[in-house]
From Swiss-Prot:
GO biological process: ADP-L-glycero-beta-D-manno-heptose biosynthetic process
Protein's recorded name: Bifunctional protein HldE
Subunit structure: Homodimer.
EC numbers on record: 2.7.1.167, 2.7.7.70
Pfam families on file: CTP_transf_like, PfkB
Renumbered residue ranges of the record's region Cytidylyltransferase: 343-475
One term of GO molecular function: heptose 7-phosphate kinase activity
Reported function: Catalyzes the ADP transfer from ATP to D-glycero-beta-D-manno-heptose 1-phosphate, yielding ADP-D-glycero-beta-D-manno-heptose.
UniProt keyword annotation of Nucleotide-binding present: yes
Pathway annotation from the record: Nucleotide-sugar biosynthesis; ADP-L-glycero-beta-D-manno-heptose biosynthesis; ADP-L-glycero-beta-D-manno-heptose from D-glycero-beta-D-manno-heptose 7-phosphate: step 1/4; Nucleotide-sugar biosynthesis; ADP-L-glycero-beta-D-manno-heptose biosynthesis; ADP-L-glycero-beta-D-manno-heptose from D-glycero-beta-D-manno-heptose 7-phosphate: step 3/4
GO terms under cellular component: cytosol
Residues reported in the UniProt entry to bind ATP: N194, M195, S196, E197
Record bears the keyword 4Fe-4S: no
Record organism: Histophilus somni (strain 129Pt) (Haemophilus somnus)
Amino acid sequence: MQYSAQFNRAKVLVLGDVMLDRYWFGATNRISPEAPVPVVRVQENEERAGGAANVAMNIASLNVPVRLLGLTGKDEAARALMQLLEKQSIHCDFTQLDSHPTITKLRILSRHQQLLRLDFEEDFNNITSADLLRKLESAVQNYGALILSDYGKGTLNDVQKMIQIARKVNIPVLIDPKGTDFARYRSATLLTPNMSEFEAVVGKCHSEEEIAEKGLQLIKDLDLSALLVTRSEKGMTLLRPNNAPFHLPTEAKEVFDVTGAGDTVISVLATALADGRSYEEACYLANVAAGIVVGKLGTSTVSTVELENAIHGRTTAGFGIMEESQLKAAVELAKARGEKIVMTNGCFDILHPGHVSYLENARKLGDRLIVAVNTDNSVKRLKGETRPINDLATRMAVLAGLSSVDWLVAFDEDTPQRLIAEILPDLLVKGGDYKPEEIVGSKEVWLNGGEVKVLNFENGCSTTNVIKKIQQLKE
């Protein structure tokens, strides 16, 4: 079966314990004269979304609309967190309190070691959920799935009411449980405990059969629709009443850091279910995503590009749709192998024989062909409000199917000049009636010792002509 990482129908609502993670990095080479502790000279800092906010970031990285509900203080940390989230187009709908700080965790690191963590928090157990419940009731019917993200900080004190609000409108509720009191999650659609959390509730399991038996009993006891047990290096197991256990082996090639892997799993699960996928497909995609994220350092997200490439068996240095950072790494490896890198760019709105022939000819000029593709906003600025006809994901998916294309990357500017200057191909190619010196990026390539070449398009082949023919047929 052919799976896809394009979630065009999905919209996800997240409610839970939101946090701000702060990191201070510095050098340490002496002990304080005041106490037997190292002195850290802070050189840089970083801020990341944590808790339920990291779940929302994972969903946003899949190009899916997401709304986040939670509790924060009225403080600088809340503003910093909102800025991080809104930069990723996440709709923040926080209940802000004068009485509590925004949950913030400050980590001080030196030489890749965490020396100290400072927590700024006060749990929300004594806070009424009335405002959150009102917001949830107002919003939930507009979304395809609800994630309740529980880190035990008190935001989900009224978790039963939250579950019932969503179930009334037939919205699936997914929860990554906290603690051993799973009864508080009764009637949720799906729980995603890891193996240790699962065994803490049902007891030690000595076989696959025992996991299935105890899991199905838990589903019955809690009136769940499904249970997904994540099992580290053993993969994950989906259990549903009247269905055989669905086991997926781990997709991880190398494990650097499991931080945030649970957030990635539940995010992809909810997104896939909100998009109308089956439980089995949702679990497959979540398993692939988990295999990607544990290969990264720190709390990370998985992009649509990475997920699509992993589904189709593409490696970072192999071929396919890439993010700019991945492309740079792939080009560096290819150049180290002595391969000649060819680069071209365009909108490629409606792929026609002229495009195919041009790309085949460009590929023959070297060992690897990079195609830089204008984003939808970039095309709109260049071609007008009616363009593009096909969105970026569609255009790149079609181009990725051509054997002549090795790597695809998107750019949002009007021209790819910055991208070309970063990549510095051995040969820059453009189709049309240009003079080499007129081609964007030619100066940068020449200064680096590269070449610039103009190729001809086939006569009569153009996207504009294709659009005109379609319009004539409509008339």
